[in-house]
From Swiss-Prot:
Belongs to the herpesviridae major DNA-binding protein family. It is found in: Host nucleus. This is Major DNA-binding protein. The keyword Lyase does not apply. InterPro entries: DBP_sf, Viral_ssDBP_head, Viral_ssDNA-bd.
Length: 1209
């Protein structure tokens, strides 16, 4: 639903400022931890933060003085043209940036970027963007301000719409408007920047010769100022602004991108194409096949044409590519003019910097920056990341009954950086002569290894982005465990230290920090690309709203569903009966009973029950009874209210329920550092093009696409088709009306030199009074699995049939340790069964105890009456939960147990059966000090004297971690309490697929749905991810409390990683699981096992209590043998394995019959709720009957008729 129009009053502003500050006044520690700078360049990019890079009173939404026009009789008057915009979230340091610490010590990243640029054919910055340009150096600016060049740093803060204007030298510095502001208690000067179009009335286009002071467009009475050109600034804008945009839009001429974007800033009414007509394309064999199949796999022909319409299919693909890029650039201009509600972040409002003195604050900031390595790493390691969406493929027109209609799925983005070095063609498919000798890589990705060139391509060939990206990759330590010795970075460095590595970037002194060393350490996690398919895309974004529907049942029984039309009931009263409010009350009730702590629910921490709750077996049984009674009572009351008071259709409502979340398009929500802003922008470009490409076949259908003017004629049509898709289910937008808050416009006096003060004698005219501001992306995930419908296509039916087996609930009994209360049993095992351990081992061992019980191998003489009662209570609870469980997730704490139990009861009331529902898991990133020497190689800051000195040098870094606030590595923890994570307004990485469809009959509007999906790469992306179709994952980095106040998975062969081996051992179970796990890890990792922390063990086994016992084994090795060694650890394993079978029942001895415990009878439903409702549960996979539906009196569902007869009509 579209939001109501909003009116915003904007102050008048120049298009940007050049800030001049004393280097000593910069908070270099804080700035360096958030900046992007390569060690081989003084150029840097900083986040725009109030109190850090701009003054506290800095205003973000402004009306920019964008030009002038003649008014009055005879055109003698001048009125200034005003354009709404907001400031870019990044500042560009072009002079004096050496004071800022380098993001990474990796050498020669500029050289690496330029080499990749040449390989892939993108234009370099080698000369001024315009002819006859005159340099304005940093020293000259300092001299004009009477500042010392040696002690001054200069950086540009510019509005989003006009950053390309600065690059193409269509601006000038107005020294007369220089003002002094206070930043962090120190004085700073800022020079306003205005467009040269002020001197050219009624000109709404770029000045191709801005340095021609005698141009005929310049007013006769005006004193023309020299345009602003600084080669270092233009080089920085060329890298950070233009490079990523050019890669995302597949335009190799970066100056063409700059001119197109600058023209859109000046001409707000332009709707046609702005990219050059000579755009080149990558030569590769385009997919041709049945678009309805959705897989994208089909036969190919060498010329890129398919079996159908072969003469035009290649042309259509290339035309769709450039027209989608053109539309995306046009929409990006609309977003640049948008007015956003979020305030620019202030360094004083960052809780992470208020944790203590300067040292503690920097450590906290360094730890938080390391947290983000999990998200940034996921974007690098995922093969379907937006970073690699570099080409457009053609799936071919649809066959079959729908073949005559245009398809929304014919053209789509593919991840194919490996073909970027192929020969280039023109729009007709002719290979350009200067690229004809380049080797063409096959589109199926065979024989392609990920390299630094691909990473440079993903970064837009910007050394600053690449350096900051390496900053995060150097902290990606908690990844998957491949267990391969040749990947040991220490060994690699020692072996190559004294030899010549064909790297071209480093020498012996800089090799530890070299980008190739980092990539080698992580090479088992680097993405592998296969044949291109129509697949989800991995996106980066930020939750800017604390509201989401990510509870187990999503937006079931929401406010909108319960509110009756024309009902005047108070909204608060309705909200009290929603599923969301009921879950809040349930959690609050459990917190009042001191069973959970709400503060820990969002932290993905163990959330264990307080030890004071359970002190003996009786109290544990009471705890289970209390949990059960509380949840069942809440569920009964909730359903009774829905049916009797609200007349809510509970079954239909469940079928319509979705998990939902919104990713903000506000530029300041992702502005922690330049890389997060860069990832957010790449996401926007990918999403825009995905939507635009869906409309290209509709545009081409029935048209002669070979016509010379087709692109110019139909580009405005494609742009309008995209704008019609706004508020269609995926991208939300709001209409904003803008006015000017100032009575007069402060601007340069055009009749006097630029050194003179400004005047306020001008009137201003707003060029855009009303605009659409794109707000957020709506992501949803259906709660129930749907196995088809009458209107589904054959291809869709085939896909659903393949998924049904994954969703079908298996017919098996409960497993205690992996069941509903397994986490409680493991946590309190020492209290409940103090003798529950193998003979010879003093540590209580729940795995050993319950394995023997469930195998009927536990000697009955070892169990007391109280033990048997406790075992019976645990088994009864587990069996009753298992009988109604349709959530393919295991509770890890009481909060999750309550949510899952409650949801299962609702499912039971709604007569759900047979299939698991879709479950959500949030993987929350964290940080810790590193322990493995291989993880700190990039931070070695002394000369290494030979191969034998590599590990001692790394050990020295580990010993001095306290003096390095940036020396942290990332970790992962998971939680199923996703809504509480989303309440922290996190930055997230998620897989997304966008479906497009028409409305009801007679409605040709295109609606969309942003479907929650997966990231290709599985455990390479994150060790806690699992290939499970019934689960959806989101990687999250919370912001509340830090910087603000309170997928289909991978294609190809999946490696048998150590993580998968360990999960297999855990799933098989056994009395001494930790022994088998420890032995497997020791065999794979060797000496590295001693450096594994609890977080690493959790990443391997996904079980907090098992991880703690595994971590304790390392300490046991030291205790028993004096020091840790592989041999000592192996000896410990042998000793423990010898005791594995000890304690089992001997031949002829009586064994405790676990199956005879109450609750092991054929699966029964939970006890009658409040003595009234009897809902018998059928075995899994069968429909449960409702013979005595006393509570609701709804009766059985109506029988479906086999067909519609004439008599019925």
């Amino acid at each position: 639903m579209e939001s109501a129009p909003k009116t915003v009053s904007l102050p008048v502003s120049p298009l940007g400022y050049v800030y001049a500050r004393q280097k000593a006044s910069l908070q270099t520690g804080t700035v360096s931890l958030t900046a992007a700078r390569s060690v081989d360049s003084d150029l840097a990019v900083l986040p725009v933060i109030r109190g850090l890079t701009v003054e506290q009173t800095f205003t973000t939404n402004v009306a920019v003085v964008a030009g002038s026009k003649t008014t009055g009789l005879g055109g003698t008057g001048i009125t200034l043209k005003l354009t709404p915009s907001h400031f870019n979230p990044n500042a560009f340091v072009f002079y004096g940036g050496s004071v800022i610490g380098a993001s990474s010590n990796a050498p020669n990243l500029t050289r690496a970027c330029e080499a990749a640029r040449r390989r892939f054919g993108f234009s370099a910055f080698s000369s001024p963007p315009v002819e006859n340009a005159v340099e304005t150096s940093g020293e000259e600016i300092c001299a004009s301000l009477n500042l010392s060049p040696e002690t001054t740093a200069l950086y540009l803060v510019v509005t989003e719409s006009f950053k390309e204007m600065v690059y193409v030298c269509n601006t000038f510095l107005h020294y007369g408007g220089t003002s002094t502001v206070t930043i962090d208690g120190q004085d700073a000067m800022k020079i306003p920047i205005y467009p040269v179009q002020l001197y050219m009335p009624d000109v709404n286009r770029l000045a191709s010769e801005p340095f021609n002071a005698k141009h005929r467009s310049i007013g006769d009475e005006f004193v023309y100022s020299r345009p602003f050109f600084n080669s270092d600034l233009c080089r920085l804008l060329h890298g950070y602004v233009l490079g990523p945009a050019a890669v995302a839009l597949r335009v190799r001429n970066l100056d063409g991108v700059a001119r197109g974007a600058a023209h859109l800033a000046l001409d707000e009414n332009h709707e046609g194409s702005v990219l050059p007509q000579d755009v080149t394309f990558t030569l590769f064999d385009s997919t041709q096949g049945n678009a309805g199949k959705g897989s994208g796999r089909a036969q190919r022909q060498g010329d890129g044409s398919g079996s159908k319409n072969s003469a035009s299919s290649g042309i259509e693909r290339r035309l769709a590519s450039v027209m989608a890029a053109d539309t995306a650039l046009s929409v990006d201009s609309i977003m640049g003019a948008g007015i956003y509600d979020t305030e620019l972040p202030s360094v004083e409002d960052w809780p992470v910097l208020s944790s203590g003195d300067d040292t503690e604050s920097l450590e906290a900031l360094g730890a938080y920056a390391a947290r983000l390595s999990g998200l940034v790493g996921a974007m690098v390691f995922s093969a379907n990341s937006v970073l690699y969406m570099t080409e457009v493929d053609d799936g071919g027109p649809a066959d079959g009954k729908d073949g005559s209609n245009p398809s929304y799925h014919r053209f789509y983005l593919i991840a194919a950086p490996y073909v970027a070095g192929n020969p280039q063609t023109d729009k007709d498919g002719r290979v350009l002569p200067h690229t004809a000798d380049q080797q063409a890589a096959p589109i199926n990705g065979s024989n392609q290894e990920f390299s630094l060139d691909y990473l440079a391509l993903a970064c837009g060939f910007c050394p600053q982005i690449l350096a900051r990206l390496l900053f995060y990759l150097e902290r990606c330590d908690a990844g998957t465990f491949g267990g391969r010795n040749e990947t040991d970075a220490l060994r690699y460095l020692a072996n190559t230290l004294e030899s010549d590595v064909p790297c071209g970037l480093c020498n012996q002194a800089t090799r530890p920090a070299c980008a190739h060393t980092t990539l080698h350490r992580l090479r088992q996690r680097l993405p592998r690309f296969g044949a291109p398919v129509r697949a989800p895309i991995g996106i980066f974004g930020t939750m800017n709203s604390a509201y989401s529907d990510c509870d187990v049942l999503g937006n079931y029984a929401s406010y909108g569903a319960l509110k009756r039309p024309n009902d005047n009931e108070a909204p608060k009263s309705i909200m009290q009966d929603t599923y969301r409010a009921t879950m809040e009350r349930l959690v609050n009730e459990l917190e009042q009973a001191k069973l959970i702590d709400k503060e820990t629910l969002a932290q993905a921490s163990p959330c264990s029950a307080p030890t004071s709750v359970v002190h003996d077996q009786a109290s544990f049984i009471g705890l289970l009874s209390n949990i059960k009674d509380t949840i069942e009572g809440a569920a009964e009351q909730f359903m009774r209210t829905l049916v009797e008071a609200r007349d809510f259709k509970i079954r239909e409502g469940l079928a319509d329920a979705n998990h939902t979340m919104s990713i903000s398009l506000d530029p300041y929500s992702s502005s922690f550092c330049p890389v997060t802003s860069f990832l957010a922008r790449r996401t926007v470009f990918a999403v825009l093009q995905d939507l635009v490409l869906s409309q290209c076949h509709c545009l081409f259908y029935g048209q002669s696409v070979e016509g010379r003017n087709f692109r110019n004629q139909f580009q405005p049509v494609l742009r309008r088709r995209f704008l019609d898709m706004l508020n269609g289910g995926f991208i939300t937008a709001k209409t904003v009306t803008v006015t000017v808050s100032d009575s007069g416009v402060l601007a340069p006096d055009l009749t006097r030199p630029a050194s003179e003060p400004p005047t306020k004698d001008y009137d201003g005219d707003m060029a855009r009074v009303s605009m659409e501001v794109l707000r957020d992306l709506r992501v949803k995930n259906r709660v129930l699995f749907s196995n088809g419908g009458a209107n589904m296509s054959e291809a869709a039916r085939a896909r659903v049939a393949g998924m049904a087996s994954a969703y079908r609930r298996p017919d098996k009994g409960s497993n205690i340790l992996n069941g509903a209360v397994g986490f409680l049993v493991k946590q309190y095992h020492g209290v409940l069964f103090p003798r529950g351990h193998p003979p010879g081992i003093d540590t209580p061992n729940p795995q050993w105890f319950w394995t023997l019980l469930q195998r009927n191998q536990m000697p009955a003489r070892l169990l007391s009456k109280e033990d048997i009662e406790t075992i019976t209570a645990i088994k009864r609870f587990s069996d009753e939960y298992s009988a109604i469980n349709f959530i393919n997730l295991t509770p890890n704490n009481i909060g999750e147990l309550a949510q899952f139990y409650f949801a299962n009861l609702v499912l039971k009331y709604c007569d759900h059966s047979q299939y698991f529902i879709n479950g959500l898991t949030a993987i929350v990133v964290g940080s810790r000090r590193p322990r493995d020497p291989a993880a700190v190689l990039a931070w070695i800051d002394r000369t290494i004297n030979g191969a034998a000195d590599v590990e001692p040098a790394a050990q020295e870094v580990l010993q001095r971690l306290g003096s390095n606030p940036a020396a942290w590595t990332g970790t992962f923890t998971s939680t199923n309490m996703v809504r509480y994570v989303m309440d922290q307004r996190p930055m997230v990485v998620i897989g997304l697929s966008i479906s497009k469809y028409n409305g009801s009959a007679g409605n040709n509007r295109v609606f969309q749905a942003g479907n929650w999906n997966g990231l290709n790469g599985g455990k390479n992306v994150c060790p806690l991810m699992a290939f499970d179709r019934t689960r959806r994952f989101v990687l999250a980095c919370p912001r509340v409390g830090f910087t603000c106040e309170a997928g289909g998975f991978g294609t190809g062969v999946r490696e048998n990683t150590l993580s998968e081996q360990v999960r297999g051992i855990v799933s098989e179970g056994g009395p001494m699981v930790q022994t088998a796990v420890f032995a497997a890890v020791l065999h794979a990792l060797g000496a590295r096992t001693q450096h594994l922390a609890v977080d690493d063990w959790i990443g391997l086994v996904d079980d907090e209590f098992l991880a703690a016992s595994l971590d304790a084994l390392n300490a046991t090795v030291v205790d028993q043998f004096g020091e840790w060694s592989v041999e000592a650890a192996q000896e410990l394993v042998k000793n423990m394995e010898a005791q594995t079978t000890a304690g089992a029942v001997a031949a002829g001895e009586g064994a405790f019959d676990f199956g005879a415990c109450v609750g092991d009878t054929p699966q029964q439903s939970t006890s009658a709720f409040n003595g009234g409702l009897a809902m018998a549960a059928a075995p899994a996979g069968q429909k449960r009957s409702l013979p005595d539906d006393i509570l609701f009196d709804m009766g059985a569902p109506p029988e479906k008729k086999s067909g519609l007869t004439f008599d019925m009509l």
